[in-house]
Amino acid sequence: MSEEHPPIAEANSQPSNGCPVAGGRLNYPVEGGNANREWWPTQLNLQILKKNPPAANPLGEDFDYAKAVQTIDVDQLKADVAKVLTDSQDWWPADFGNYGPMFIRMAWHAAGTYRVGDGRGGAGAGMQRFAPLNSWPDNVLLDRARRLLWPVKKKYGNKLSWADLIVFAGNHAMDTMGFKTFGFAFGREDRWEPEQDVYWGPEHTWLGDERYTGDRDLENPLAAVQMGLIYVNPEGPNGNPDPLAAAIDIRETFGRMAMNDEETAALIVGGHTFGKTHGAGDAGLVGPDPEAAPLEQMGIGWKSAFGSGKGNDAIGSGLEVIWTHTPTKWDNSFLEILYGNEWELTKSPAGAHQWKPKDGGWANSVPMAQGTGKTHPSMLTTDLSMRFDPIYGQITKRWLDHPEELADAYAKAWYKLIHRDLGPLSRYLGPLVPKETLPWQDVIPVSETNVGADDVAELKKQVLASGLTVPQLVSTAWKAAASYRNSDKRGGANGGRIRLQPQAGWESNEPDELAQVIRILEGVQESFNAGDKKISFADLVVLGGAAAVEKAARDAGFDITVPFTPGRGDATQEQTDVESFSYLEPTADGFRNYLGKGAQIPAEYKLIDRANLLALSPPELAVLVGGLRVLGANYQGSELGVLTDRPGTLTNDFFVNLVDMGTEWTPSPADDGTYVGTDRATGASKWTASRVDLVFGANSELRALAEVYAQDDAQEKFAKDFVAAWVKVSDADRFDVR
């Protein structure tokens, strides 16, 4: 894999979009201007809850990609990709006559944006096609790789997404170069607009590193050391060529992508077995990135004025490194060369720090990218980390003597890399999916549930008669289901992991209260399962929430059935990676008025972020907050935002009382971030509320929604809309039935 990032074309040191205010005037909307954002830069951004609208999808709402992709002749697809690999094009010649290493890097950098902290990034939607990723310094020259694949995409059309093709091409490239990959799953569906909801960092310049505080503490959830890089700076921290310091950055950033030390070492060693980097000349001769490039370049950026600008004259990262004498073949030569030499610091023709063998060792032993010339092997600072860091060194030294262990470790680490954001196994499609499952895949056993409609009705009665209250049942079902995050399709009620560690111990889940509810629900399950019919614990948690919502609706005068789809399985503690699942723990849950310690942004912003991870629309966000308040589902039974005198009843009282101008809101004397609502006429205290509650009256867009649900004719509509949104969250992880 080639590793690129310009030091970087100084001619393009600013993000290509620049400042939206030019020449003292606001830009036109078609120029990227957003007047509201300029006037009120901290305004809540509800647009992220309206992303990927059906109108933007040229394939139409009825197109079923999961069905279409499974009609592909995968053997023919392999042959078509293999043909592209060695069909060198004059406009961008293949290094060593093979585009394979370039495609590996393309796939790596598509998948490698994933971070486990919030599940965002990754290859799952083909985002490498769009800004900012298509113009990140670390993705220099990958625009060519995607264009080289266009004939394949053109042939297969809508049956093969760019998201799948980008990753498949890199995976199959290794198969053609003598490496046995672990497997491959299709199922990544393209999106048609850039992701505007991913926080890539605070910097305004490429390669900025304002994300650090203190003694190099990296801001969460970021998983790269500088703006525009995938992981680390290959020259070393901020260009400091110190392999041991670089190892610290490597461990931090790869760890934030859920990779352990062995997986990290395998990816670096295995990936750098292939290809080269590009730094043949002065990086100042490199033109603007794709988003800033002239119209006539048709989306191809980084045009170089050095020599021919391609082949042996190519400039990408500014590093000019060829690792091995067999750059298009899988073998153990990377480690043999890494350990077979002592290394001295040098600079590439572009002025970037890299390493070469001391005393002219291994001269003329590796091929040039083009022609018959020879040169010496080189290494990146981060490559030397694999030898000189004590932990990585112990691992790679073992692989030097046991290359078969490296091959196995790399195959599984690569498979994890390119599938980490694909979600549960029910989303893995195609004939190349391996039968073996791995711990990070959040395995869920087949459900034992076999209930019919009459059984469901009887179970609802039993749950409501168990002594559990509406707030207990609602909050427990919510805690289970709302652990889902749509970014990487992890979490949710399926698996019943609400009763397992780490979820059972999360502060937001109120462990003591939760343990009591679980004990009672398990008793109901045990009693019911003593007969011929069975229900899983995961299903029972969701069913209990449904029963409670139905009761609350009846108490409000509405006979509403909450749809329930059985079929959830129960995972075991042994099937649950505690460390990996710990990243799903919410730091805030505005739906239950929970705010953990150390929040970096105010609670109302955290609410929008959580709604986004749940794939909710603004109206769904509104009805869920309003409904959960009146149902009494708050954290620790708090009265904040419970704007009703009939809690436990599914009414629109939250909105009615929130927009009532007869109430005056002031900050609480306790100075704890809460507010007190008093009667304007009498001064009597009426309510208490949080920032999350008041934002539905203060923010103009959210108030517009609140007013709809506060109207006299909205009571039944509110109840029905709440149920629809509730079911959406309850079933968010049910990819097995949709």
From Swiss-Prot:
Q: What class of enzyme is it?
A: oxidoreductase
Q: Where is this cross-link: Tryptophyl-tyrosyl-methioninium (Tyr-Met) (with W-108)?
A: Y231-M257
What does the record give under GO molecular function? Answer: catalase activity; heme binding; metal ion binding
Per the UniProt entry, the Enzyme Commission number(s) are 1.11.1.21
Q: Which SUPFAM superfamilies match?
A: Heme-dependent peroxidases
Q: Which InterPro entries match?
A: Catalase_peroxidase, Haem_peroxidase, Haem_peroxidase_sf, Peroxidases_AS, Peroxidases_heam-ligand_BS
Which biological process terms from the Gene Ontology are attached to this UniProt entry? Answer: cellular response to hydrogen peroxide; hydrogen peroxide catabolic process
What UniProt keywords apply to this chain's record, in alphabetical order? Answer: Heme, Hydrogen peroxide, Iron, Metal-binding, Oxidoreductase, Peroxidase
Q: Where does heme b bind?
A: H272
Crosslink Tryptophyl-tyrosyl-methioninium (Trp-Tyr) (with M-257) sits at which residues?
W108-Y231
Fetch the Pfam families from UniProt.
peroxidase
Matching CDD domains: catalase_peroxidase_1, catalase_peroxidase_2
Query: Does the record carry Heme as a key word?
Result: yes
Swiss-Prot/TrEMBL catalytic activity: H2O2 + AH2 = A + 2 H2O; 2 H2O2 = O2 + 2 H2O
Under the heading NCBIfam families, the entry gives: cat_per_HPI, PRK15061.1
Q: What does this protein do?
A: Bifunctional enzyme with both catalase and broad-spectrum peroxidase activity.
Give the protein name, as stated in the record.
Catalase-peroxidase
- Organism whose genome encodes this protein: Mycobacteroides abscessus (strain ATCC 19977 / DSM 44196 / CCUG 20993 / CIP 104536 / JCM 13569 / NCTC 13031 / TMC 1543 / L948) (Mycobacterium abscessus)
The gene name on file is katG
